[in-house]
Design a protein with these regions (language model features):
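Short, hydrophobic-biased segments on the C-terminal half of alpha helices
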Residues: 52-56, 341
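Catalytic palm active-site di-aspartate
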Residues: 221-222, 350-362
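Adenine-nucleotide phosphate-binding core of ATP-dependent small-molecule kinases
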Residues: 319-336
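A short, conserved structural fragment
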Residues: 55-73, 350-353
């Protein structure tokens, strides 16, 4: 197979998967030669800059369409080029004798990513530790690939989330399930969180309705994880010794009464733990606030009054706030998540979805998850009895744990969602 033919196939299959998920979906495409390093570990298909000419040829022959991007370095704005299938190509897609479920990620796709200070991926040499992490991720991704993960009551496999400029389309499909670990600042001790899977971008209200192979799910999270981790670094067991809502404040009177003070305090504290200076924390807070919300309009003085109250409330860890401590905490919660992924993949052979400090498992495995979350937290931090909250409630609670000696498929024998069956037709 010639290189050109291979590249055409890659482009058309990518467009087919996008079209199958959402007929209006475009794919980002870089026209920068430097974006294509054929020998990079992050380029599993070894795609070189030749692909730019291939795309230009497909556009000139009206097989695909393109919207050119731009980059205004003065204003700091821009977007990458987008490509999508032409009407002629969409007609061909409708006649295809295969479906999106027969298209899978390349087996050599790199799940361990190391980024530099500019958040760009960098090459690295494998070590025994990295190889072990990769093996875990590879086995975990195989399990996810074999699991049908869906939101049961969607008429179309699509969510519109966010508002204003942050409004985006989130495809709920069986292709966006690949999970990787990302380390930062060219340092294996910085970061290490698990990223990937459409569920990480899915609002909590929709996560409650996730099904795995036709089974309902349950989600459990660590309460105030990063706050608890900071206290544990000071030798304090937060829930055993303090046991207060870490985000509850009183006496803040200079803000819009429509603002939920607890929610604002939570967002500000978490951004301040990640930021290395106050101004960056305030900017990050407003950036993450919803468009048009009163939180979006909060001034630096208003945010400073909340942050000062949080520092007084959390005096033992006040020195860690706006110190850039978040990246080190990401290493710890990445280690906790790795332990949970390993035990569910290898011991229970049961899929688990990760959302940084919360986890989703098939309903009936939630008590196992609760126990394993406690075990993982204690193993990594040395702190016992962390509080974990059930964030999904069901009236039809199962009273009996699954029998782990039985084959996993026995527990996943419920019928898949009706939309899933329609997609397979």
């Amino acid at each position: 197979e010639t290189t050109s033919k291979k590249l055409v196939k890659v482009i058309l299959l990518d467009l087919y998967v996008a079209w199958s998920a959402d007929p209006d979906l475009m794919i980002m495409f870089s026209k920068n030669n430097n974006s294509y390093k054929a020998k990079s570990r992050y380029n599993e298909l070894h795609i070189g800059k030749t692909i730019i000419k291939i795309v230009e040829g497909l556009v000139s022959n009206k097989i695909i369409e393109i919207k050119d991007g731009f980059n205004d370095r003065v204003k700091g704005i821009g977007f990458q080029s987008r490509i999508w299938a032409s009407d002629t190509l969409k007609t061909k897609f409708r006649k295809a004798k295969f479906n999106q479920f027969q298209i899978q990620s390349h087996s050599e796709r790199e799940p361990i990513v190391l980024r530099d200070e500019n958040k760009q991926p960098v090459e690295y040499k494998d070590t025994e530790t990295v190889s072990e992490m990769r093996e875990v991720l590879s086995d975990y991704n195989k399990l996810l690939d074999q699991t049908h993960i869906d939101i049961y009551d969607l008429e179309k496999p699509l969510l519109i989330i966010g508002k204003g400029k942050k409004k985006m389309r989130l495809q709920i499909n069986q292709q966006d399930k690949f999970v990787r670990r990302v380390f930062n600042k060219s340092n294996w001790n910085k970061g290490g969180r698990f990223y990937g899977g459409w569920w990480q971008r899915c609002p909590k209200d929709y996560r409650k309705r996730i099904m795995m192979d036709g089974m309902m799910t349950s989600e459990i999270d660590y309460s105030g994880l990063h706050v608890v981790l900071l206290y544990s670094q000071e030798g304090i067991n937060y829930w055993a010794e303090i046991n207060e809502d870490p985000y509850h404040l009183i006496g803040i009177n200079n803000i819009d009464p429509n603002i939920d003070l607890r929610d604002a305090a939570k967002l500000l504290l978490l951004t301040a733990i990640n930021a290395d200076e106050e101004l960056k924390a305030f900017q990050a807070f407003r950036s993450q606030a919803e468009t048009g919300s009163p939180e979006k309009k909060m001034t630096n003085d208003q945010l400073k009054s909340i942050l000062s109250a949080l520092k007084r409330k959390h005096e033992p860890i006040a020195h860690k706030i706006t110190s850039g401590a978040g990246i080190d905490l990401m290493k710890i919660d990445g280690q906790i998540t790795e332990q949970l992924v390993k035990v569910f993949t290898y011991k229970y052979k049961c899929p688990i979805l990760t959302v940084h400090d919360s986890y989703v498992v098939p309903f009936g495995y939630d008590r196992i998850l609760f126990r394993e979350m406690e075990n993982a937290f204690e193993a990594i931090t040395g702190t016992t009895h962390p509080v974990a909250n059930h964030t999904t409630e069901y009236s039809d609670i199962l009273e009996q744990e699954p029998n782990q000696t039985e084959d996993i498929h026995y527990h996943y024998s419920e019928p898949a969602s009706q939309r899933h069956l329609k997609e397979l037709e």
